């Protein structure tokens, strides 16, 4: 099937300075997957990122963490699609979203960047908005629009608080389940579960 999931990309910024920040929750999801499933990432310079493989046969996935910094993520994703011979429809991008409460997920088969520089770069390099993305809620820094704008950078580049960590753990588990469901069921059926995902703490 042409639209079978083949490549999962977690967006984030490389380096210890950004480890554990809200903007890096895409990286965090793939790192947790690697830890649980017992595989590791390796540097692949031609793809400008860290790459891993998981599964066999029809369930085999390539996983990518671009090392280009968020604003140039699309360069790494374009290189990976070309190298492996995949189409944008066979891609899933894991991306943080400030417009979604922490603990919630939103799956979309296509769409605009929504103000996210990593998605903007991906759209530019792929030449299309038609690729699946899993938006992972990180919550907003404030309800007031002016205060929210003023605190956006410090919020996304800040770390999750100790109080938020239990919800982070739950949503990362949800991301891994979401990937498995997309593999088994496809985007539409999996989306029903993913878009309804809501830990009790955020209901």
From Swiss-Prot:
Gene Ontology terms for molecular function: peptidyl-tRNA hydrolase activity; tRNA binding
Subcellular location per the Swiss-Prot or TrEMBL entry: Cytoplasm
Active site: 23 (proton acceptor)
Residues at which tRNA binds: 18, 69, 71, 117
Annotated site residues (Stabilizes the basic form of H active site to accept a proton) in this chain: 96
Entries under Gene3D superfamilies matching the protein: Peptidyl-tRNA hydrolase
InterPro entries: Pept_tRNA_hydro, Pept_tRNA_hydro_CS, Pept_tRNA_hydro_sf
Transmembrane segments: none
Any one GO cellular component localisation term in the record: cytoplasm
EC number: 3.1.1.29
Superkingdom of this protein's organism: Bacteria
Subunit structure: Monomer.
Function in brief: Hydrolyzes ribosome-free peptidyl-tRNAs (with 1 or more amino acids incorporated), which drop off the ribosome during protein synthesis, or as a result of ribosome stalling. Catalyzes the release of premature peptidyl moieties from peptidyl-tRNA molecules trapped in stalled 50S ribosomal subunits, and thus maintains levels of free tRNAs and 50S ribosomes.
Record PANTHER family: PEPTIDYL-TRNA HYDROLASE
Name this polypeptide is given: Peptidyl-tRNA hydrolase
Organism: Parasynechococcus marenigrum (strain WH8102)
Gene name of the record: pth
